[in-house]
């Protein structure tokens, strides 16, 4: 987090939720009670704002996938989804991104790519979904 960003947040009265999982569709929704409580993807920032949260951080989770991954493609896809949501939600959303220990070269390339995109939050790491 840059010093300028930190200074703008500290003392501003802003509340940051550091552990969210924004989503584009139901397959990426991670709520425990999705059958009873489901927000449309675009409602998330509004719902958080109503709770007093002005900035939310986190990665997109592929809840449709469970088990070992045969390639890095799906990891890259959810990282791309986080970039898309950053465009949609603007400064209210700080995206996080995934890496995968079975794909070290690809993960290092992804760290470099996301850094070029201005994304510096690595996580959440999800061995329980990505099979490691």
Task: Cite the ranges covered by each PLM segment.
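An N-terminally biased module of ancient metal coordination in phosphate/nucleic-acid-related enzymes
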Residues: 1-77, 112
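Active-site gating/metal-coordination segments in enzymes
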Residues: 72-132
């Amino acid at each position: 987090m840059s010093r300028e960003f930190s200074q703008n947040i500290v003392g501003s009265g802003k509340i940051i939720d550091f552990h969210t999982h924004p989503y584009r569709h139901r397959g990426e929704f991670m709520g425990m009670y999705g059958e009873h409580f489901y927000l449309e993807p675009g409602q998330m920032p509004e719902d958080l704002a109503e709770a007093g949260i002005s900035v939310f951080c986190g990665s997109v989770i592929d809840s449709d996938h469970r088990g070992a991954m045969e390639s890095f493609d799906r990891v890259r896809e959810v990282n791309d989804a986080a970039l898309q949501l950053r465009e949609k939600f603007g400064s209210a959303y700080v995206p996080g991104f995934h890496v995968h220990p079975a794909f070290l070269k690809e993960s290092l390339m992804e760290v470099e790519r996301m850094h070029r995109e201005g994304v510096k939050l690595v996580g959440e790491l999800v061995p329980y979904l990505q099979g490691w």
